[in-house]
Every structure is written in C-alpha cells, then in structure tokens.
Amino acid sequence: MNLKISALEFVQEVKNGNISAEDFVAKTLERIQSVDDKLHAFLSVNEEAVDKAQEIDKKVKSGDKVGACFGMPISIKDNMCIKDSKTTCASKMLEDFVAPYDATVITKLKEQDAVFIGKVNLDEFAMGLTTEFSAFGPSKNPWNTEYVPGGSSGGSAVSVSAFECIASLGSDTGGSVRNPASFCSTVGYKPTYGLISRYGLISYSNSIEQIGPLTRTVKDAAFMLNIISGLDINDNTTLDDKNEDYLSEIDSGIEGKKIGIIKEMIGGSIDPAVLSATKDAIAKLESLGAICEEVSLDMVQYSVAAYYTITATEAGSNLARYDNLRYGYDFPVEGYEFNSYISKARKNFGPEVIQRMIIGGFVPS
C-alpha cells in the first residue's frame, strides 16, 4: 500500500476500485503506531477511523453518492472542535475538555466523507513557532528529529510529511501553517481572511487567525480549499466565494501575471540562504512568463510590532475565560482567597502563554 500518494490520487484510486479506503486507513494507523513514538505528531488517534472508512467503501461498491474525500485520512490541529472528542489546545488547562459541537470546517469535511485519523500537536493555544511549547511534549521534524518541525501547526506538518495522513488542517496567525510547512517540506496555505469559517476554532487572535490546509501538493491544497471555504452563518466575518473552484485554473499557467516583490522584505538581515532561494524562485516565476516587479511597502517595518500588539491584546482577552471554574483542574482553594486561586489557576498555562498574557494586559493599558 503506497501511503505517499496525493489527495487527488487517493480519490481517483478509491473511486476506480483500485484501493479501498478501509485498507488505506488501516495502513495509515499502522504507520502512526510505528513512527509516532519518535515524532509525536498526534495527541490522540481516532480508533473508529477504520469503521468510518468501511462505511464509505460500502457506499462506493453500492453506487451510492460518495463525498469528494472518499474516506481520505485527515489529521486536525487540536484547537478545532470535533464533537465528543477531546480538544486540548495542547494545554493542561483543556486537558479534559470534550468539544460539544463540530467546527464548521469539520462539518464540511464530514459531509464530504473525510475520515479524521486523529488530533495533532501544536504550541499551546497556537502560540509559538516550533511546537516546543506543547504541554504534552514537542513534536519532531521527520526529516531530522534533532530539528524542530516549526509551529504552531507542527503536528499537522509532521503528520503530512511523515505519511501519517494525506492532508491536515492547521491554523495560521503569524505563520503557523506556512512556517511548519516550510520546515517539513509540505504545502501550507493561509487563505484570505474570511474565506474559511473560524467557528469552532479556539481563538488566539480573532482579527488575524485563519484555518488553512497542509498537503503534499498545491493541487491538494486547492482541493481542500474547495471543501472548507465559503459563507457560514455562525461566523459573520466569512466571505461568500460563490462556490469558487480553486482547481479550475491551476494548470492554466502564470504567463502575464504580475507579482510584486517587496523590496523591504528581501534586504537587510535576511539569511543569505533564504535570499538565494527567494531569488531562485523569482527567476523561476519569470521563466514561466510572470512579470516580477519590485514594489515598496515602507510600512512593513512595523508589521512585527503591529502583529504582537494585536495578537497579545486579543490573546489576553480570549484567555481570560480559562479561570479553572469552567475549564481546567479542580483543586481545593484555601479560604477561596482570590490571589491564591488565580495563582494556582495560571499554573495550568505554560511559559509562552503566560508571557503573552502579561503582554496582552500591559499593551492596552
């Protein structure tokens, strides 16, 4: 069984009867069991995945209508709600939290007969760029386990890169899909804000974060986007993409397309190897007929400061709900003295989260 096939190849193989979803999912679970002790991509594995794949195979054989995923095994970053499943955000604060509803992206994938293979690791509450800030231990880069996989969607990137699933969903605020995709040699895409519903995503920074796919190929990313994008009455920031087909023009080429090269982003302290790779990419785009023009965005110098100001402030507000009453551990509080209680409640957060909470309290004051 070739676990290295792309999403579109998997769909075609199952549709044609060359492979069964059940066998593929079973082999994927075996793969997880054999490699994930070293990689630690998964926080939980769905033991019912094979049963779900079996149901889909029955629909294929009987000629019933089958969703676009045809039983494809997909991993989900553990900050998205799947009903009746643990959703921990890689935090002790939510270690025992069981989601009471499905995120909209989960509902859409279920409608298209995806199989959720498990929930994957992240930096706690999606705050970090290495997946070292998980309360349940760091994930490892499958190309070299001495290296980090990037973050915060490190578990998503590792699971795709190590053939523990075909595709994954992550979330991206300041690079949390794109960064681990780069580190693990997968495709990571942060869609336009509002293109994908954030309903059921446990919030870090509402103004910036966005759910996005991690896949093996660009076509697979477009395939996933076709499924999970679109208007949602539960998220009033969503856009109506009018059932756009993101695969329709993917082979049409880029001749004549204008691409802006931000000059402030390719100078200064950029690493020489990164600069060289960027210049190679520009040359490749030009060889394919694109028009690459240098543009100036002088405000980009403030982007990191603006990012931390917005995200820390919103994170501080969002994290205020985790008070150990509605979420977190139960513990006796001596005399219910407030400062003692708050101090103990905050021990359920890791150092990176606490740091951002402190900044989030300081900045707006």
Where are the predicted features?
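An N-terminal boundary/leader segment
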Residues: 1-51, 287-289, 352, 358, ...
